[in-house]
Structure formats: C-alpha cells, structure tokens
Amino acid sequence: MLGKKYQPCGVIVSLDGTDIPFDHYIFDVDPKEEYKLVIATSPGGAEYIMANSPLKHPVIGPFKTIEDVDHADLGELYTDFNAFPVIVTGQGENPDTKVLMYALKKWGLEKLCIEAPSYCTHLLQQGMLDEYFINYSMVFAGGQKSPGYASEFGHMDHPHADFLTLGIHESNFIFTRQKIRYGVTNETDLSGYKY
C-alpha cells in the first residue's frame, strides 16, 4: 500500500459550521474502519460546532498565520476514530484557505481530492488548485447544477443511463451520449449507505 492509509482522510470545510449535519452517517462509521474525518472552519464556526454538536471535537488551532502552524504541535491525525478534530483558521467567520492547506500538509495530507465545485472555484481564485477532474455519473440526480434542476429527482426515484459514446475533440472538449433507462428505481437506498 506504499505506506498510505487504507482509508483516505475526509475533510469537511465550512465557513461557520451551521451547514454540517452532525447526525449524517459519515459521523457514524465503525471506528474499526479507521476512517478519519476532520472539520475545517473559522473561529466562529468552531464556536458553533462546540455549542451544537453532540460529537467529540478536539480543537486544533486557531491559526491565523502559517507561522502559527509552524509553531504548533498538531498531534497525530490517525488516532481516536471516535473523534472529529476541528482545525480552526482565519478570523471571525472567515477561515484562511492558505493556512488550512499548509496545516493539512503539515499533518501529512499531501494530495487532496476536492468534490465540491464551489470549493474548487474558491481554490482556483486563490491560485491553489493544481489539477482537477470531472466525475461524471450516469445517475440523473442532483440539485441546481443538474439538468432539470427546477424539479430534480430524489435519491430513490432518479432515472439511470448507460454510456453509448464518449468522445474527445482536440484536447479540451469531451462529449457524451447516454441511453436513458426508465423504471430503475429503488436499486440502492443511499440513505442507508455505510462506509
């Protein structure tokens, strides 16, 4: 396994902590799976989390500068899989992305796979995104970013599709063709999904 952990470390980034559902199943992964989940937020977000979450949250920071991180002992990341560390950067309700990325690297996280398009955009604006990939699912679901966003499908009633064609035009344009499969519902209830 090239010295890497079996499970990647998950990082939830939130401006103020109010958008984190602490009853989500990601906070209920069996500790034997050794899945580590970290929350990154602002000082205001850390206050909200400590006041509103029933979970165990050791606080790492706060860090206003890279020098603050240099002088800190972050401790070992892959311990106590029942705890969800909160790494605090920035001031007020504004986390500091550059300080966060520096702290994550110091913690041993060399590569990050960012799922959220809005956070990828934020990293691009900061000049901090080296590469990106597009995850293209054949499940017609989603919210305002998907076709038919005004009346999106739920996780139990979405149509599926099969790839028919995947093509490329020069080096910067991909096109696809899909065959819709209707009536494929309730294949997997994602609300019960466990890691």
Feature locations, PLM:
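Enzymes that bind and transform nitrogen-containing heteroaromatic metabolites
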Residues: 1-195
